[in-house]
Design a protein with these regions (language model features):
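Sec-dependent signal peptide recognition
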Residues: 2-8
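C-terminal motif of bacterial Sec signal peptides marking the signal peptidase cleavage site
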Residues: 13-16
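Bacterial signal peptide processing site
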Residues: 18-20
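N-terminal mature ectodomain segment of secretory-pathway/periplasmic proteins
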Residues: 26, 30-101, 124-127, 132-135
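A general structural signal for short secondary-structure boundary/capping elements
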Residues: 65, 73, 99-104, 118-127, ...
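Flexible, processing/modification-adjacent segments and terminal tails
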Residues: 90-160, 182
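Gly/Pro-enriched, hydrophobic low-complexity segments
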Residues: 142-229
Length: 229
């Protein structure tokens, strides 16, 4: 009798284990999109820790140094502070009614150069193509590429397209901007001199093919609520 009771108890335990397994099926890991892979390669997973970003956007031509625009951005509050020449503007992007349009347009432009890998994830209204092979515009090296195309209405860049070339590690190396999705390139530059700022990787220099034109980002600071090693 004791033996029969033990067998019955063992049977109950086995059934219980099987029931638990069926109630907790193995979680299927979601495949990342190409936008997420590129963003993560540049440190997007650390963006949640970012409290403040500072940088200066300038364009140097030959020996002429650009004056630049300096920005402080608090992304969690979406507050922006701009300094350029004698102009100082502080505003919230949650209320743009009283903000000069040229100031916010400049911020969106300059932020795009600094954080285009993340814009691929942030800009949900844009269309991103499938990955294909293409010849990079500056190095003429064959790389993987995608095109991000913006809607024809709304925003500061309606209908514009960007061809983005990246390496095997999903790091952006070059791009081409095509205004209004024109077949003719409007601007092509490199993405080089990457630095890591508390886990966020930013390309500091963007040069044309002749090397005498350089759109650069300086004075970069990324402040986080926790230290990223």
């Amino acid at each position: 009798m004791k033996s029969l009771f033990s067998i019955l108890m063992l049977f109950v335990v086995i059934i219980s284990c099987k029931s638990d397994k069926s109630e907790n099926p193995t979680e299927v890991k979601k495949e990342l999109t190409i936008a997420e892979k590129i963003a993560n390669a540049h440190g997007y997973e650390n963006w949640k820790n970012v409290e403040e970003v500072q940088f200066t956007f300038a364009v140097d031509r030959d020996t002429i140094k650009g004056n630049g625009r300096s920005w402080t951005w608090l992304p969690k509050k979406d507050s922006v502070y701009m300094q350029t020449g004698l102009q100082n503007i502080k505003y919230s992007r949650k209320n743009l009614d009283s903000v000069p349009k040229n100031a916010d347009r400049a911020f969106i432009n300059d932020k795009y150069w600094a954080f285009v890998p993340f814009q691929l994830v942030w800009d949900t209204s844009a269309t991103i193509s499938e990955v294909k092979k293409g010849k990079a515009p500056i190095s003429e090296t064959e790389m993987d590429m995608i095109t991000i195309l913006y809607p024809s209405e709304g925003g500061y860049t309606p209908g514009d397209a960007y061809d983005i070339y990246f390496d095997n590690n999903y790091m952006i190396k070059e791009w081409t901007f095509r205004k209004g999705n024109s077949e003719t390139p409007s601007l092509s530059t490199t993405f080089e001199n990457y630095e890591d700022y508390n886990g966020i990787k930013i390309a500091r220099d963007h040069k044309k093919d002749n090397g005498s034109w350089n759109l650069n980002l300086t004075g970069i600071k990324v402040k986080t609520k926790i230290k990223v090693f």
